[in-house]
Amino acid sequence: MENGVEHGVDESGENQVLSSSDGEGDCDGDGEVEGEVLQPPPPPPLQITNDCVGEGVQAEEGERAPATTGAVDVTPDPGPPPTDGAAPVAILEDNMCDKDVDSDAGDEDNDDETKENYEGFNGTGRTVTLQTLMAANVLQPGLGLMTIEYLGQKFVGDLLADGKIKSHETETIFLTPSAWAMHCKRIINPDKKSGCGWASVKYKGKKLDAYKNTYLRKCALQKETPLDDCELDAERKTDTPEIVVKRTVFAHNTVSNRNVVHDANMLIESVPFTSVGKLQPFLITVNSSALLLADFHCHLTVREVCGYLGGTWDMNTHTLSITKTYPCRSTRFDRQRAGEVERDIQKMMIQDQLLLVGWYHSHPKFQAEPTLRDCDAQLDYQIKMRGASDLTYTPCVSLIISPYYDENPTLESVVKCIWIVPPNENRQSMEYGRPMLMQYSVLPDKEIPEEVRSEIQLCVDYYSQYRSEMVKFRNIYNNDVTYNEKLKNTLYPKFPSKQSDKALWNWICAVLDCEQEDDFIPPKTIKIIDNDDLEVKEEDKPVVLMDLSGDVKINPPKEEQFSEAMGGLEDSGRKAEEESNAQAEQKASELKVMSLQEQLCMPSGLNMNPVRMLSPLATPNPTSLPPVLPNLGAPVLPATPSQLLPPQVPAVTAPPAITPAVTTSALTSALNASPRDSPITIQSNSASPAKFEVPVRASPSPAKSDTSSHASTSRTRNSPAPSPGKFSVSDIARNSPSITPNKYEAAAAALVPPAAACLPTANDLMAASLAQLAGQLPPNFLQGDLAALFQQQRKDYGSSSLNQLAAAAAKVGGSKQSNASASSGLNDPNVAAAVAAYSNSFNMPLPTGVGIGGSGNSNAHSSSKSKSERSSKSSSSSSSSNSSSTSNSYKTKLMKELDELKNDPLKMSELIRSPEYAALLLQQAEALGATTLGTLGFGSDYSYLTGAGLGVPAANALTGGQSSNSSSSKSSKSSPAAAAAAALSADYNNLIQASKLLGYDSYMQQSKQSNDLNAFLQQQMAVAAASIPPPPQTASSGSSNSSSSKKQQQLQQQQHQQQQQQQQQQAAAQADYTALLQTYTKLFDPNNQFAAAMSSNKHMAGAHNELSALLSSGVGVGGGASGGGSKQKQKDIQSDMLNQLLQLEKQDSEIKALLYRQNKAAADLDALFATPSGAVVGAGSSANAMKSGSSAGNSGVSGMSSPSSLSNQAAYYNALAQEKMQDYAAFFQQQHGKYGIPDPLSKTTLAANNMFMTPSALFKIQQESLSAMMMKPPKSTTPSSARTRESSASPALERLTPTKSASSGGSGGGGSNSNSGGKYNFSAVDLAISSVPSNTPSPAPSDGSSGSSHRRPSPDIGRLYGELAPPGALLGSGGVPKKRMEFASVADLAAPPPAKMPKNNMGDDILNLSHD
């Protein structure tokens, strides 16, 4: 739109500067009016010159066609502004068109005399140029004949024989009076956007307008008809050979300076984002019927036409969907109707409930490239339509359609989608915006909507009323090709898939008054018109991919065509995929491709809000199973996308279930498909028949998630189709398909019952690398918070899915690696949950129970065993309903082993020294006892824990296990446990029944949450039990607090062994507690029978009470030995702990964040901290227990009545949740304040949007936002700041997603070694922590390999619900929960450790929190 070189350089090649350099497509007035008019409220039709249609005609004439076209292209004339305030549509009068680039008419918009011009030539002036007047002998060439007087200055020029003007002052040659006038006016008043030059330029002292009007009158008189441009044109054409002006397309860098006069009709080359190493800021999909209507409209006349694009904008997926086109039926003959036409369009858009998302116009006979004027006008529209805020931002695009460009090798129109990148903020007055070629996908409609038919009919009726305005479709277009045949070739690819092509085509022929076809013969090949040989070549390419259609239409019968095309497409797709992958890799190295998370967090055109709005819970489509996806770079959907799906639904429309794997159109699918790629991504400008580019991954500016970056981080939550990788907590809560991060099959997950989905989700989450998880879970979200949140809203959506997620996330942090290795995976409660979910399929009792029974202590046994055993366990888990005898034998075996260990000092020392043992100890809190059992030497039989051994059927295994465990634990205090078990068994049975009703998947899912809970409880109970029975445990727990890691480890080991024994003995009790937990957990489940009771009582009600009793009894049994504590006391402790946590949270969060950064470290740290440490109080609760288990473990530790502790826990949990909610609410408020959504109009926002910002400014902003949001761990120590920081990433989300906080309990630093896994760079804090004596002797750092996970401290529920951990844990373990480090964004998690590490002493602080 800006001065496009429509005119091109002077034929002579003289240095003619086309003056329309800044043509905004409007005269000064126009542009301004337009801006004002376009108001966001109604879809304001972009101010597009309606007469643009007229311009096309000029183009046809050739002399100024190029220029004219340019003018028309974008310029909205300052035509009558929409009278309706509602119609923000700036009305572009035909004057714009008049101003065809060449045509002085365009300039008519002249500042002062625009109206006069209109009156004079009534729109016909559009075709009048100096050449025209000279040909009619109205003007004669001569020296010094042309003058301009402006603000007291006079400029003189020569009228050359070719109709150009040579300036005396600058010796520059101007193609049109307008160009010269603008140039001269700009010299005097640079800020003035001068309009048409015809009213300013004088010939022999008389304004050119007067000459033009005189000429037009004479023509009209001769015709004895009202001035009719078409007629004038026709007459002139017959008299004068058509002057074909060859348009030259200039690179944008050739017109970099606005201060040099450029022809506004100069064509500027638009380049794809890939050419500049960037990602397209948003995806574009166009409905085939909308494209068909626009293309048809442009074919009706050889003059420029224009229209508006209506559609929708999905912030979540950054997808602009163009669903309807609204032709502007206005020509130079009825300019006065322009405003009315636009208001009608506006009303139609409102009625259709569509947004104005752009405009289209035609370049009838020249290239589909924007003119400078088009560029300016388009940029204007983009600015006007960006909305008041990021939330209201809507992109605006321009389609340029070239129907009759004679150098087009095919018969299909060239359709290009243009979007302007604004110049740098500080150079806006100096530079033109840069036109970028946007890739778009064409979504085939099943049928042609009725309104499209009516629009086609109206367009034909409108243009046919003006003589010589409409193309005669029976005539020959080129060689032997008629206009009708050309139209058929271009429209056919856009025909609806389900409708009869013949019927539709014959209807169009009837409308155009052409011969109808008896047998519809689809254009089988793309006809290539060879201009040189004038022969029509036929390409064999069956698929016609025209830029313009972007549709993948295969000419042969559609079905066959598709199948035929598919093979080729697949091959080409594969190649393209490989190439694109190679390119991507190359670019990654060259450009340092940021991860989606990072990109999302960056301000970019994509995400007009630099602030993360939503943090994906899972990577868009973590199709890759690798546990660790180091960078969340826009994941390419591996296979799913590549399936060639017929162009079906754009990614946007893809059913949510499929979201992860966006269905790509056959073509694109063949290509590398990104989750955000739309079905058919065709390069908008692909002129060649079958040429298509690999779609640019439209990530919001990168990654602004493809899921633009932080993948999906900042998409809006309300998008119709959840963006592939984005999961909102709410989604998770309701297990919406989009949410389920089932890594293996998003689609499947979507279809799976929420519960089932969740389970895999946990697994997937765990499997996913921390990075992946990080991408998925906003680190800001603490699991405790999640849990609290859920508890608060348990009624709304069971905490299960969220808890599961939280737990999974937390655990994943720890178990991701473990997940990788089955053994480690099993250890994690989350993993356990996942396993449980899977084991469900095997009818395996809740692994939770298993985990509980086996509780990390069992891990102490041979870790090597655990692996094989684990695998077997999983299998055995399926057969978890083994006879109780089996479990008993296991117990016996376990006890024997424990005895041996006890009695054999060598073995003991060995065990104590073994890293596995340390890890096992750390993991003792893990829910999955199977792994634990395996490590204990139980073998892989889950049944033992599940209670298969207990003699309980798998379903009842837990219950049974409880009972049998109780029996075995009778030795340790089985009577209460047994009683509880009995009570529980009923509940448990109920739960089981419920689970059956719910279906194992949902049950498992719940169990997952439960797992978190269970793990939490189990940890506490196990710890309590372990620590309580043997004094050494107490000592050990105390020692764990103690600095000497060895002693602690030994104590812990002893503890562990004792615990194991106790567990074995109490396995019953623990089993009971496991059952309890499960039941209890179930209580949490929204679906759970007990849930109601639970929600009603924040304490466990009914079954809960029993459960709590059981649990407490179990705890009491195990940990009852420790001094007794009252519920109140525990509560107080808990609250204290909570407060401490909250206060310390900052550090904690920082540490955790750091840990999180090191993907694996988080879990390990948590586990570390959670390592069973003898409570200082003497209660042995793992550090984890301290936090999470603090209530349960504490109760055990403090010797509180276990029942009370349990029920307390529930109550505490709920209360905590509530508190947390409060905090969160406040936090969110804070967040908003701190990281509010930027004002869209603010420079920073614009910069973020890549609009109007200097690169440096943009860069700075990006850096700031990145550092604030992503890279740097919060520096402030205050919890609020920590929270704020984490919140910065995404205000609401952050809290919604569980954060993997490495809230490891007190001093357990032993696990830290594992944290320092070789793979990851650990932050100073991590190192500091690892350096601290650990509770466990684990000498071997986990390398981050999943295998090492078994050594890794199990993520402790405390970590998961660290905030929930009753303060008692603090007291009990003598450790204070570490502060949780919260990251502003997922990116933080995945990001390399911050340059500045928190002081090492921070780690110490954390470790020593217990002493605070």
From Swiss-Prot:
Compositional bias per record (Polar residues), positions renumbered to this chain: 702-720, 1275-1290
Feature: compositional bias, Low complexity: 873-891, 1036-1066, 1360-1370
Record domain RAMA: where: 113-219
Any coiled-coil regions, as ranges: 572-600
InterPro entries: JAMM/MPN+_dom, JAMM_MPN+_peptidase_M67A, MPN, RAMA
CDD domains per UniProt: MPN_2A_DUB
Top EC category: hydrolase
GO cellular component term, pick one: nucleoplasm
GO molecular function: metal ion binding; metal-dependent deubiquitinase activity
Residue numbers bearing the Phosphothreonine modification: 1297
Domain MPN: 284-420
GO biological-process terms attached to the record: proteolysis
Biased composition annotated in UniProt, kind: Acidic residues: 23-35, 103-114
UniProt note: domains: The JAMM motif may mediate the protease activity.
The protein, known as: MPN domain-containing protein CG4751
Organism: Drosophila melanogaster (Fruit fly)
